[in-house]
């Protein structure tokens, strides 16, 4: 019986992009199902008292430099040569996160990948409705219709509810994954997830 890997997801996180590709490989190897749960990382930080690593660790001499080294190693290991840090990072992802809630299941997984490519490879501004609509249309979606759907009050509330529910489950950052009730934080935990799925 196929098991599900739930990705607590916000495309504002560079680690969400970096984790995505080896996670897809893991899903293919194990036959698991990938589910994406959109949240707002900023809201999660406010609810937990957490902060982005580059802010939180700035007071520790050498820590951010080492984190950058580890990121480069991860990029090299997984061949993530299309990764580009957007010039406007950090940015608001309210719009793309709401976009993800306009679809479900496999369609949401596909849309998440499209958004990651647009933001982290092509540099499309995540907070620019016109630019996002254009990128979505180019990828085969009805970009204007999807953008319009994000204004549904139910979509807006669902994003808030998802964020609060994730924190209630113990989440404090991105990327977080669940397999059943087992929580894993960080792209470095993908091996542990695969071991659990194989067990």
Describe these PLM feature segments.
Residues 18-119:
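Structural alpha/beta surface segment adjacent to cysteine/selenocysteine redox centers
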Residues 3-6, 10-33, 37, 105, ...:
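C-terminal cap of thioredoxin/glutaredoxin-like
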